[in-house]
Amino acid sequence: MSRVKRGVTAHAKHKKVFKAAKGYYGRRKNTIRTAKQAVEKAGQYAFRDRKRKKRTFRALWIQRLNAAVRPFELTYSRFIDGLSKSGITVDRKVLSDLAINEPAAFQAIVEKAKAALAA
């Protein structure tokens, strides 16, 4: 069996890491050891924050809904309770969008939720 020199493979691997580390500051962009560590850590942050993004957006929608229902003398929790009692199954993302872009439609939903709470 012939001897295989690893130069081509190593160069390809390094090139892949440096491409991912493009734009990093200092040695992180041009030293293989630090670049590899930085790319690995960036991947960990990306994985963690893809999960966190879902929580953050849900919290944003809830804050928007709470602010949107306050003029109707409701709190967020009472509003959601009214929605469930009236059988309206619209998620928070859509409700938040309605509150911003379609105030008339949102008002109609709030009135139905209030009616369900009163009954």
From Swiss-Prot:
Keyword check for Ribosomal protein: yes
Entry function: Binds directly to 23S ribosomal RNA and is necessary for the in vitro assembly process of the 50S ribosomal subunit. It is not involved in the protein synthesizing functions of that subunit.
SUPFAM superfamilies (UniProt xref): Ribosomal protein L20
Cellular component terms per the entry's GO annotation: ribonucleoprotein complex; ribosome
Family classification: Belongs to the bacterial ribosomal protein bL20 family.
NCBIfam families per record: rplT_bact
Gene source species: Bradyrhizobium sp. (strain BTAi1 / ATCC BAA-1182)
UniProt keyword annotations, A-Z: Ribonucleoprotein, Ribosomal protein, RNA-binding, rRNA-binding
The gene coding this protein: rplT
GO BP term, example: ribosomal large subunit assembly
Pfam families: Ribosomal_L20 (PF00453)
InterPro entries for the chain: Ribosomal_bL20, RIBOSOMAL_L20_CS, Ribosomal_protein_bL20_C
Protein name per Swiss-Prot or TrEMBL: Large ribosomal subunit protein bL20
GO terms assigned for molecular function: rRNA binding; structural constituent of ribosome
Top-level taxon: Bacteria
CDD domains hit by this protein: Ribosomal_L20 (cd07026)
